[in-house]
């Protein structure tokens, strides 16, 4: 049969205080967690430094959208608050445009779609190809810059249009001849391969130019002197034989 444990009044008070403290602590933790959850989603764009003025440029628009999407996620801004505060990020033509279309956007996704639709509409594939093949690599264009620009255009095509091998085929003929002389098409299977080999060529060319400049300066510094009397190279005025001969003849005539 279980035995009852008798507690003194002092022990009973200590037990009650311990239970009360535990209850208060649990309530505080729950309130703090609830406050954190409540505060999450109540952020806004008031401190966001990214802005958009209405430039009709695909890269500019995508950079702006990417920046504000990241800011929204990091700050824990809800879709509702983001939609309410997106006007803070517009200025100039974009601000005027938003005043006219804001009622069309009832969700955050619709607002982003409107920005893309108006300032960066999807280009037809033929136009992208025209821009892609319009310019070849200039002699002074670094291969990194050229490849980045061309790949950005190809990225605007419908997803899955070309694999990487096909994109390399499209790009390879546009490379400057100084790269194609040293890089064969079958030696590169990825853009990483192409860039690595291209950088090696650029580094070697830079070394060649530096050595050529150094050699040119060295030749210039070792250039033989010119006699100011007879204008021939290889000797100076003081040891010019023609001057000495002419001087002897003058003395002889005297």
Swiss-Prot record:
Induction, per UniProt: Up-regulated following stimulation of E347 brain neurons.
Record-level Gene Ontology MF annotations: identical protein binding; mRNA binding; structural molecule activity
GO CC annotations, alphabetized: extracellular vesicle; membrane; postsynapse of neuromuscular junction; sarcomere; synapse; virus-like capsid
Annotated knockout phenotype: Strong reduction in the number of synaptic boutons at neuromuscular junction in third-instar larvae.
Quaternary state and interactors: Homooligomer; homooligomerizes into virion-like capsids.
Function: Master regulator of synaptic plasticity that self-assembles into virion-like capsids that encapsulate RNAs and mediate intercellular RNA transfer from motorneurons to muscles. Arc1 protein is released from motorneurons in extracellular vesicles that mediate the transfer of Arc1 mRNA into muscle cells, where Arc1 mRNA can undergo activity-dependent translation. Intercellular transfer od Arc1 mRNA is required for synaptic plasticity at the neuromuscular junction.
Notes on the domains: The protein is evolutionarily related to retrotransposon Gag proteins. It contains structural elements found within viral Gag polyproteins originated from the Ty3/gypsy retrotransposon family and retains the ability to form virion-like capsid structures that can mediate mRNA transfer between cells. Tetrapod and fly Arc protein-coding genes originated independently from distinct lineages of Ty3/gypsy retrotransposons.
Record family assignment: Belongs to the ARC/ARG3.1 family.
Name of the protein in its database record: Activity-regulated cytoskeleton associated protein 1
Organism annotation: Drosophila melanogaster
Gene name linked to the record: Arc1
């Amino acid at each position: 049969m279980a035995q009852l444990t008798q507690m003194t009044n002092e022990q009973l008070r200590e037990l009650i205080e311990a239970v009360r403290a535990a209850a208060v602590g649990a309530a505080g933790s729950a309130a703090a967690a609830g406050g954190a959850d409540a505060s999450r989603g109540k952020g806004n764009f008031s401190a966001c430094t990214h802005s958009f003025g209405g430039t009709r440029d695909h890269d500019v628009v995508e950079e702006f959208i990417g920046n504000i999407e990241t800011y929204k996620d990091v700050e824990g801004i809800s879709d509702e608050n983001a939609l309410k505060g997106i006007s803070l990020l517009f200025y100039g033509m974009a601000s005027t445009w938003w005043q006219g279309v804001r009622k069309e956007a009832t969700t955050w996704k619709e607002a982003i779609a409107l920005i893309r639709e108006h300032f960066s509409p999807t280009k037809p594939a033929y136009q992208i190809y025209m821009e892609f093949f319009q310019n070849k690599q200039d002699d002074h264009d670094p291969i990194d810059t050229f490849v980045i620009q061309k790949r950005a255009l190809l990225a605007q095509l419908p997803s899955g249009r070309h694999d990487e091998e096909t994109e390399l085929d499209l790009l390879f003929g546009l490379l400057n001849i100084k790269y194609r002389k040293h890089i064969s098409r079958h030696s590169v299977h990825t853009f990483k391969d192409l860039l690595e080999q291209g950088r090696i060529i650029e580094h070697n060319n830079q070394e060649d130019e530096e050595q050529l400049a150094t050699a040119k300066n060295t030749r210039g510094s070792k250039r033989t002197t010119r006699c100011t009397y007879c204008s021939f190279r290889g000797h100076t005025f003081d040891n010019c034989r023609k001057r000495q001969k002419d001087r002897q003849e003058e003395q002889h005539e005297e």
